[in-house]
Amino acid sequence: MTIFRPHLRFLFKPHFLYFQSPAGQSSRPFSTSQILRTALDMPPPPVDTTQRLAKLRELMAQNKVDVYSMQFRYTIKAPLIITVVYSFFFFLLLALKLCLRKTAISQSTLLHVMGVETLIRITAAFISSFTGSAGCAIVSMSKAALSTDGRYFSQAAKQLDSNWTLLKRGVEGVPTWEEWTAEQAENGKVVGVDPSLITAGENLHYTPLTSVVVTNCSYVIADARKLSQTLKTTGGSLVGIDQNLIDAVWGNERPARPANQITVQPVERAGKPFEEKVEDLRKELAAKKRSAMVISTLDEIAWLFNLRGSDIPYNPVFFSYAIVTPSVAELYVDESKLSPEARKHLEGKVVLKPYDSIFQASKVLAESKASASSGSSGKFLLSNKASWSLSLALGGEQNVVEVRSPITDAKAIKNEVELEGFRKCHIRDGAALIEYFAWLENALIKEGAQLDEVDGADKLFEIRKKYDLFVGNSFDTISSTGANGATIHYKPEKSTCAVIDPKAMYLCDSGGQYLDGTTDTTRTLHFGEPTEFQKKAYALVLKGHISIDNAIFPKGTTGYAIDSFARQHLWKEGLDYLHGTGHGVGSFLYAEVPLSASNVLSNEPGYYEDGNFGIRLENLVICKEVQTAHKFGDKPFLGFESITLVPFCQKLLDASLLTEAERKWVNDYHARVWEKTSPFFEKDELTTAWLKRETQPI
């Protein structure tokens, strides 16, 4: 989806996608995926939000709340990936979040940071009708505003009704959501945050309030600090609120946390025994002279212990915490979820503790400090993405050192087994996409079938299921025709999606989770006769894609520098796109990673013309060290190995718009696509013919 920006798309620290029922009351189990999909069946936007806003303001007045602000960022892909899944549960959630007494900002940097973000987005969608994956909704007694970034300008403009003002993030002259909130909360008003839903790194003054607020959305790390500083300029302040009303309001209707089974990621696919990973972490603790690390990031826990779950849609993680000391590794998880294989995997090596006991255990850890014999400073290591409440349980600043998690860095560097898994799964996934595109063209052109965007996405899933080691999609498929392709994180819904027009551009962004790796591929096709401008725009995007693929740069180069390689050709024509050129990808996990050898990243420049079409060309690449004639400063140089194997659209390829070197790149790439994928279609004449045509030299 969207490379090279130090951001948030896939590094996700989720926490509770569930709420427990009070003691003595039954809990209703639920399927996370089912809930996510149910929520997507919302009325066609825009929705008239007048009554909802009136009710919100009524509750705000009753509770003496001047401003209600809710920042959200989902983290899965597809419009988003997490970009991707969107709404549901609004009514109960909404009601709750309104019961505040002070100015309230609802965030989503939860304890784990991802699960509840989904619920927040649901609430945000309900109050604003905007279903995008990132933004901030702010409501005062007389105004309502929605701030979002360039990926969602088009979508927000379509979904917001006249009650709302769209704050286009990054556009000159448009206030940030923090500035807009400060304007509404001036003259001594208070903005409240739930300490379990904000990162520990904020070091905000903790002032418990009798009435609460908040909920979640991710990555408020810098935002909370910035908001706090901004509020001070108008006399406002930001405080921690001790209680969360969601549990109280939801009552018996609150769903239980997922009880999906946890399985083992065998060392043949993980590439390294979990015992060695734990020992590596202990060495890191010793080097930093820390007595323990408390881990709350779900993908880090799954990676560390070579375990996989399915508590978060499209992401093989499970709700848990972990504590690693020089002598003990503890996993806080619902034991009933562990498969017999997983129990045996951990037996005698990891101490299992109840999931809900993590805060009490953290308090005990803080009280005991580190043993004198350990030689440590007695402080505990905590990720700077962990919740403020977890930091407080460990004793706060005097006991905790908040840093970039060493596990994040360790898992970002894929080992050879993981890299080989990526290469192999991309061959199979490439074959699946080739089969799909061949089928789609035949159905539309030869058979004259009427297929909508969801029909296409469903067929692709059906095809992928036939290929070895397929687990499921890695995000909701973006199947978009014509103008819908211009909505960067478009999510087709059966009730409102368009019929695929063979005379228009078709953009398909999809990915699969395989036992040996994760895929993410975008191709833009045309089944009829594209315009000259469409072919030119396609060539400009392809040139940028090739520039990234051919890039060679010294180790330590920032992503921003490389991002410009992809945009340069569009810039020369006065064109651009409003998303990053790529993102990091996990190994049957999710992760946003910096540029380093053995990282797996996406290369996906694009161009979008509102109301007309969108173009995006995405391959996954492995960052690797390359040989150069010289090594300036004795630094190694890095480059990329493209592992995606799907041809580019011949009807959109105009060889005259490419240089000789670019044409050679395309021909070499297509030759490799044919070599690797054609054996899958020895008995499939339709797909073989399509693949042969699409990979012919230009």
Curated annotation (Swiss-Prot):
The keyword Zinc does not apply. It holds the Pfam family Peptidase_M24. Gene3D superfamilies: Creatinase/methionine aminopeptidase superfamily, Creatinase/prolidase N-terminal domain. Catalyzes the removal of a penultimate prolyl residue from the N-termini of peptides. Belongs to the peptidase M24B family. PANTHER family: XAA-PRO AMINOPEPTIDASE 1 (PTHR43763:SF6). This is Probable Xaa-Pro aminopeptidase P. The gene is AMPP.
